[in-house]
């Protein structure tokens, strides 16, 4: 990881530079950087609403990033040690649904833990995917479910060689991490 490069905040820096241009907004959002909604300014603060602008050329485009958003995604991937990272505006739900809908079709099997978020179930309903559940163990003392066990994932893959994806909650809602590196290696084998 390039620690010096990680000090950059390309989207924020572009928003600050754009703000200094004193562009008069005639598009969305309707609060017009707070001038159209003083209550919003009181609630969120001037700094927040002054940077809430539409996607204009110097601010890049999330659907086809080529400048500051692309750089931010590259920085995120570098920070997480990932091959790629994608910024989403619809939260985790839209990210999860995008992942599943882009990989699974009707009848496709997807290996996943039983304790997934409802967004996963919703995406499977939308595309017609078939779940292959790997039940997580429970920590009886704490009363919480644990991560996916590598051996159970391996068995699910062996039992379902036609599965098109493995979905992992990592970390779980309780902060438990699975051995994601080994699970990824199994899935890609």
Language-model segments: what does each one mean?
Residues 84-110, 123:
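Conserved beta-loop-alpha segment that forms the PLP phosphate-binding cup at the N-terminus of a helix
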Residues 46-94:
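Conserved N-terminal alpha-helix of the aminotransferase class I/II PLP-enzyme fold
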Residues 69, 90-95, 116-118, 172-176:
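Gly/Ser/Thr-rich loops at beta-strand to alpha-helix junctions
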Residues 115-118, 135-141:
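Short, acidic/turn-prone active-site loops that include or flank metal/cofactor-
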Residues 112-131:
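Substrate-binding/gating loop at the entrance of the active-site cleft, primarily
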Residues 142-189:
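Active-site phosphate-binding strand-loop segment of PLP-dependent enzymes
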Residues 1-67:
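N-terminal "arm"/small-domain region of PLP-dependent enzymes with the aminotransferase-like
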